[in-house]
């Protein structure tokens, strides 16, 4: 059974693979905007041949119009992505049938070797293929988990801006492939029927990708070990949200990996006032990028000071979107037990940090309290109630 831990491992392997493969140079045509549009346009003649009925023709025409409008909208972004080194020699055929779990390790196999044009692509096109495949199979939660862990590993949140284009493209490729199979003379009637239904399902999925979502901005608030990351981890799957973690971005700003040990005395090292300011500024910038791409964003940080929260409330107001403050807590004895017992991870907090936070945190203002949802992570029913409140 495919589980979240499997997709997290595949995200790590694929992210690391993308980091080390060759990058398309400026003198290569691969990844140029016109090369991005070309394979997308090639889907439509075949789709019209596979689905000649009037109703399908109208849907295909609308999807082609969206593709062309999207290309015009993101043309400069496609060029920027290549300039910034995100067009690389990728796997090229990254879907579930080319992934395996062997001896408790992830294995990615059968890369696309015969056509370099389909292999030298934006890494986000490759990510979009697997995200689409998971969603098409009814695994939206696992798709969100994979996407989040890939982004957390690479920091490529800017790539979300072009992800909708690639999701539509990948869904239409699958629609075309199944449509062609349904027309093959040597296929039996059962296979033709199954492929025909799959073709229509992928077409419907592509249409859903073209519909703008209603993103919202969610920030966590709580001291170390209160369970912020555990809560946000659950919300990733249920909301299809993108999470940004202060523990990870703080270290990224310093050129460190998430697993690096950056422990220091309270308000020292990466956690001094300058480091804290830079981290929250980074979180605000990334949240804006994620929202602009049409995704709900969860900002996983302590947010113990009003001055840290206010810019995020202002961002939500500016964008005209829903804003939520998750007040995440647990009894102090539980907090201390968690600090002592938890394994090393992205967080560097110890008991001294917890003591400082408990003494210095600022309560929500009256203006902020209307956005508050409370979660006691020591109570089993609390998370379920939160899910209901956010639906």
Predicted regions, residues:
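Conserved lysine of the Walker
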Residues: 228
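Hydrophobic positions on the alpha1 helix immediately C-terminal to the Walker A/P-loop
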Residues: 231
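Conserved substrate/cofactor phosphate-moiety recognition/catalytic segment
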Residues: 234-295, 337
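Small-molecule kinase domains that catalyze NTP-dependent phosphoryl transfer to phosphate-bearing small molecules
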Residues: 341-387
């Amino acid at each position: 059974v495919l589980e979240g831990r499997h997709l997290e491992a595949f995200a790590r392997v694929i992210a690391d693979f993308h980091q080390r493969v060759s990058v398309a140079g400026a003198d290569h045509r691969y990844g140029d905007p016109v090369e991005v549009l070309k394979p997308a346009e090639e889907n439509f003649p075949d789709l019209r041949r596979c689905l000649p009925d009037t109703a399908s023709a109208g849907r295909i025409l609308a999807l082609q119009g969206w593709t062309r409008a999207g290309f015009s909208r993101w043309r400069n972004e496609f060029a920027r992505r290549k300039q910034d080194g995100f067009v690389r020699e990728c796997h090229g055929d990254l879907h579930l049938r080319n992934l395996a779990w062997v001896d408790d390790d992830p294995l990615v196999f059968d890369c696309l070797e015969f056509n370099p044009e389909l292999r030298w692509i934006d890494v986000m096109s490759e990510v979009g293929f697997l995200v689409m495949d998971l969603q098409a199979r009814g695994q939206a939660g696992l798709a969100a988990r994979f996407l989040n862990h890939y982004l957390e590993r690479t920091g490529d949140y800017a790539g979300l801006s072009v992800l909708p284009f690639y999701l539509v493209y990948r869904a239409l490729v699958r629609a075309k492939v199944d449509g062609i199979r349904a027309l093959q003379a040597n296929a039996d009637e059962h296979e033709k029927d199954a492929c025909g239904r799959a073709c229509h399902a992928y077409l419907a999925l592509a249409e859903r990708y073209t519909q703008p979502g209603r993103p919202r901005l969610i920030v966590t608030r709580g001291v170390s070990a209160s369970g912020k990351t555990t809560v946000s981890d659950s919300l990733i799957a249920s909301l299809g949200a993108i999470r940004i973690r202060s523990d990870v971005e703080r270290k990224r700003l310093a050129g460190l990996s998430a697993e690096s040990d950056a422990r220091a005395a309270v308000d020292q090292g990466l956690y001094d006032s300058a480091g804290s300011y830079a981290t929250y500024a980074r979180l605000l910038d990334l949240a804006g990028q994620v929202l602009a791409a049409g995704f709900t964003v969860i900002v996983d940080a302590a947010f113990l000071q009003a001055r840290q929260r206010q810019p995020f409330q202002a961002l939500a107001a500016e964008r005209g979107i829903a804003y939520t403050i998750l007040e995440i807590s647990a009894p102090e004895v539980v907090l201390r037990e968690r600090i002592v017992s938890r394994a090393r991870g992205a967080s560097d907090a110890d008991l001294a940090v917890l003591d400082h936070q408990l003494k210095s945190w600022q309560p929500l203002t009256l203006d902020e309290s209307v956005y508050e949802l409370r979660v006691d992570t020591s109570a089993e029913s609390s998370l379920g109630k939160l899910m209901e409140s956010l639906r």
